[in-house]
Amino acid sequence: MKTFRDFKKKIKNNNNNKNNKNNNINNNNSNNNKNNKNNNNNNSNNIYTPSISIIDNYDTLCSTPQNLKSNLKKNLNINNQEFITSNILEIDWNTIIDIEIIDFGNSIVCLLVTLSSDNLHFNQILIKSTPTIAQECYASVLQNILKLPILDLRLLEKNNEFLEMSSNLLDFSKDDQFLNDFIKSEFEKTFFLIMEFRQNGKKFNELNHKEYFSGYKGQEKFKQLGKIIAFDIFCNNFCKTNIAGDDSSIYFSNIICYETPNKNGWYFSLINSNISCLNNSLFTIGYRYHMNSLKLLLFSIFQNPSTESFQIRMMREHLLKKLNIKLPKSSAVYIQKGIAKGIKSIVNYINYPLLENTKDKVKNIVSCDNYNIWKKGIDSIHCPFLLDVLNEIEIEISNRREKVYFVKI
């Protein structure tokens, strides 16, 4: 099998041959090979170090999303159009040319696999395993109904394709003990998501926030963040968006941000969304605490949409204190408008029969037994909590529907 080093040399040699048509091709190849060796020895910082190398440091091996395309583009001398749209179907696992570990933060770690069958066009996909596979698939179905910006994904079980995928990934990474061990540990899990990968994304805490959220486009981006918050509220995912003000969380850690919108107008992609019910009892303190926080936020938004709510102010203060991210006070109004629009969409499209039907559909995707993680995950999805949230939302909207100050979205 070709190594990434062989592939890199071939691309560099081809480019040099085009620029030096009158030179002898064999001499060019030998000279380039010598130069590559010298450059690797004398100036390794300027040459791409493929992931297939002996690296025993996890932080060194991991990449962050914004660096990925620049690395490949810089070192393979390729143009934007030569990166094809991420294709998660009919993957030829024999064409792997690179493997990276991406740490998105907040315990979200994926494999980024680059494939190419002709050395001219490239396909990049994410491989993700998760202990909350059932909840994540369940949330993805609901997100699709609400037209939220989820990445294209499909479920991969331990079948023939899994065997082909695993054998090729392990064979390609055999010279890198750390990467190989990481892949082996991932393959001990039962279910995997094959996910689309969008180029040029950044994590929320890596943005130039003043520049990114400036102007009219910035207002639209804040509204889109509000829609995402609305869904996380609905799923009791306070650990993600931290509406309750928990200092241990990182806001928006489950999104990737882009400079240009996708075909549906979204500037963001969701890479992780779970139904994370903290408890299932109506009578526990935690349950009522979250419900009361939700009611307070809804009341604030629908009662005074142009006034920053307590929860959104807590969010901005947290971002400034913990991450040194300063969002302007004016952002609160647009975020709250987005939350209101997201809530209205939930009320219009989600109901209790749909929640139960979705649970049944997800349960039927794979065969379940009484012991596997999928079955336990499905059983942990607590529809009564979601129904309680939905009821609270519907009550607030009903109470405010006739008011002139109802938020205009």
Curated annotation (Swiss-Prot):
Pfam families: Act-Frag_cataly
Coiled coil: 5-46
Residue numbers spanned by region Disordered: 1-45
SUPFAM superfamilies: Protein kinase-like (PK-like) (SSF56112)
Disulfide bonds: none
GO-annotated molecular function: kinase activity
InterPro entries hit by this protein: Actin-fragmin_kin_cat_dom, Kinase-like_dom_sf, PI3/4_kinase_cat_sf, Put_AFK
Entry keyword Ion transport: no
Biased composition (Low complexity): 13-45
Keywords, alphabetical: Coiled coil, Kinase, Transferase
PANTHER family noted in UniProt: ACTIN-FRAGMIN KINASE DDB_G0268748-RELATED, ACTIN-FRAGMIN KINASE DDB_G0279609-RELATED
Protein family according to the UniProt entry: Belongs to the protein kinase superfamily. AFK Ser/Thr protein kinase family.
The protein's name: Putative actin-fragmin kinase DDB_G0268812
